Amino acid sequence: MKNIQSLIFTLSTVCSLVALSPSVMADAAAGRAVYDGSGACGACHGALGKGDGPAAAALDPKPRSFSDGVFKYDTDGDGIAGTDTDLFNVIKYGSAAYGGAATMPGRADIPDSDLQSIVAYIRTLKN
């Protein structure tokens, strides 16, 4: 029993360190800069990702709130919706490419590395 407790403690510590690693936090910080800047994500999704940006009132359907951490698209057919790959694909190609609304445009003009950083930032917005 003591070995199992030690294993669980070790695994949870490692997971915590990975989740808070400087590279992940740097990616999220870079993602926020793009989200707020050239990505213009906040115009629809809001500064805190709650779907309440200044342009949101004019959109139907309303922009997704990132605070609940629930995403509906399985863009790569792996049977799991809302993975980092799924978020990346929806941001890059737009939700209409996956049967969603055209109100979420694709942003293929943004470099892939910046799109990955935006995904990292969006993950930090979950309550």
Predicted regions and their residues:
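Detector for the c-type heme attachment site
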Residues: 44-51, 92-96, 106-109, 123-124
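Solvent-exposed helix-loop boundary motif
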Residues: 56-70, 74-76, 88-93
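Bacterial N-terminal signal peptides that target proteins for export
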Residues: 1-12
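Short sequence/structural segments immediately N-terminal
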Residues: 28, 34-38, 98-101, 125-127
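Axial heme c-ligation environment in periplasmic c-type cytochrome domains
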Residues: 74-115
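Sequence/structural segment immediately N-terminal to covalent heme-attachment motifs in c-type
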Residues: 27-47, 56, 63
